[in-house]
Structures are given as C-alpha cells and as structure tokens.
C-alpha cells in the first residue's frame, strides 16, 4: 500500500518492571528508574504509517469498532483536557487510586474499562515526542548542546542507564500514529512497537486536541527499551521500545 511501509524489527521481551515515566503527548519532568533484565529476542513485522490520510482512515475505522458508551467517551474527552493532572496524581501515588476524589476514581475506572474495547488489530508502530526531562532531571540541562545537537557524553550516559531496561508508566501514555509535525522540535522521539491484540485506542475523533492522530495506551504499562541512537543530524535521540502490556485488567 502506497504511503504505508512494513519495517522488520527486533522485539526484545523481558521479565520484571521498574518505575514511572511519561504520559501526555508532550512530557513533563519526573523521576525514572530502571534495572537490568533477562531478554529473549525474536523478529516480527510492524506497520508504520507515512501518509496522514491513510493513518486517519485506519484510525477512524478502528474507532467505529469500539462501541464506547457515552460515559466512556466523556471520560476520554475529559482526560484529553486534563491529562497532566490525572497522570501526575497516578505517578505520585504509584498507580493507586484509593484516596482520590470520587469523581476522579470514577473517571480512571471508566478509562480502564474502555480499553477492554480498544485493541489494535495488527502489529503497529506508534510515536511520541519528549523533552530532556523524559530521561530524568539529571539530563534536563545537560542533554542539549548550545547549537541544539545532542551532547554525546550525556547521550552515552543515558544509554548506559536505560538501554535494554524495562520502564513502568503509572499514568496513561499518549502516542500518535505518525511521527507528526509537533514532534519536530522535540529532542527525543520514541517509537513504540505495539503487538496485535494489545490494548490501545485511537481517540483522535473525540480528543479535545484533535489532529494529533492520538493513540492512547493504558496506565500501568511496561515497555522495554530495545534501541537508542542519534538521528542523522544529531539533534534527536531515537528510542525504539516494545510495549509489554498493562497490569490493569478491569472486568
């Protein structure tokens, strides 16, 4: 299909988890932790959209299949308006919602439940852009050189800390079907490999910020960082990560 290519990629599965990372489409500072794990690698194929019209058509077709209830749609719309607040609370409490205001508990429960209906029908590549704080506060002021390129010493330090590690995100993870224009100025691009049948929902049709081709991933998800490399112009770190799944499975 023109505008759509299939990439042969290496999956790395692992056992174990770590600590919180990100969530809105553009990320705010937070602490992150990682540890080494046992690995098992194998090859698979993922679809990567390069044409915006085809990406929208695919996403809209998926959205029509979900059959979300009115309350589930309202919870998603509300989330897109206040993702930072919701995810901030989830990270602060390590995913535990006991003690949250009753309306927020209800919203989180509805969001979690909606993922029972939102699953990807095929292996697919998703994207998100982040600032240096994604790697932790220690990189916030050291990752970029004055000319906008990635500092190689800081990059090697980040690789030593995160490459071939698992990361656990207590909040929801906003991604896009394409490496869209709003990521152009972001120094970190993560390419998520999401396997067929994984919980992931195309929510752009009802997002408060439509046009980002947004795919939402569930909270308390773990992903494995398979690869970290510099872009050809040296201005971005390209991370490839495999989504491992979520520990949240509501009935």
Curated annotation (Swiss-Prot):
Keywords: Glycosyltransferase, Host-virus interaction, NAD, Nucleotidyltransferase, Secreted, Signal, Transferase. Changing residue 109 to A: Loss of interaction with human RALA. Residues 47-246 form the TR mART core domain. It is found in: Secreted. Gene3D superfamilies: Toxin ADP-ribosyltransferase, Chain A, domain 1 (3.90.176.10). The record marks 214 as: Transition state stabilizer. Its EC number is 2.4.2.-. GO terms for molecular function: NAD+-protein mono-ADP-ribosyltransferase activity; nucleotidyltransferase activity. One of its GO terms (cellular component) is extracellular region. NAD(+) binds at residues 80, 87, 91, 128-131, 167-169, 183-186, 212-214. Changing residue 174 to A: No effect on enzyme activity. Disulfide bonds: none annotated. CDD domains: VIP2 (cd00233). Changing residue 212 to A: Reduces affinity for NAD 2-fold. No effect on enzyme activity. Residues 1-40 form the signal peptide. It catalyses: L-asparaginyl-[protein] + NAD(+) = N(4)-(ADP-D-ribosyl)-L-asparaginyl-[protein] + nicotinamide + H(+). Monomer. Interacts with human RALA. ADP-ribosylates eukaryotic Rho and Rac proteins on an asparagine residue. This is Mono-ADP-ribosyltransferase C3. It comes from Clostridium botulinum D phage.
């Amino acid at each position: 299909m023109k505008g759509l290519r299939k990439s042969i990629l290496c999956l790395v599965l692992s056992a174990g988890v770590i600590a919180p990372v990100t969530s809105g489409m553009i990320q705010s500072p937070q602490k992150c932790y990682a540890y080494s794990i046992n690995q098992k690698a194998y090859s698979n194929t993922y679809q990567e959209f390069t044409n915006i019209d085809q990406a929208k058509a695919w996403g809209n077709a998926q959205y029509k299949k979900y059959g979300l209830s009115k309350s589930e749609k309202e919870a998603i719309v509300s989330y897109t308006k206040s993702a930072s607040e919701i995810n901030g609370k989830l990270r602060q409490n390590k995913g535990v919602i006991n003690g949250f205001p009753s309306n927020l508990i209800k919203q989180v429960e509805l969001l979690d439940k909606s993922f029972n209906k939102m699953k990807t029908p095929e292996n697919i590549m998703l994207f998100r852009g982040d600032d240096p704080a994604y790697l932790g506060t220690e990189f916030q002021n050291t990752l970029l050189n004055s000319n906008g390129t990635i500092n190689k010493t800081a990059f090697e330090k980040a690789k030593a800390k995160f490459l071939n590690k698992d990361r656990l995100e207590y909040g929801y993870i906003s991604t896009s079907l394409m490496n869209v224009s709003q990521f152009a100025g972001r120094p970190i691009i993560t390419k998520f490999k999401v396997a067929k049948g994984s919980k992931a929902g195309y929510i752009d049709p009802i997002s408060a910020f439509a046009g980002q081709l947004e795919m939402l991933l569930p909270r308390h998800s773990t992903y494995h960082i398979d690869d970290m490399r510099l872009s050809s112009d040296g201005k971005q770190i390209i991370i490839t990560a495999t989504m491992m799944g979520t520990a949240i499975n509501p009935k």
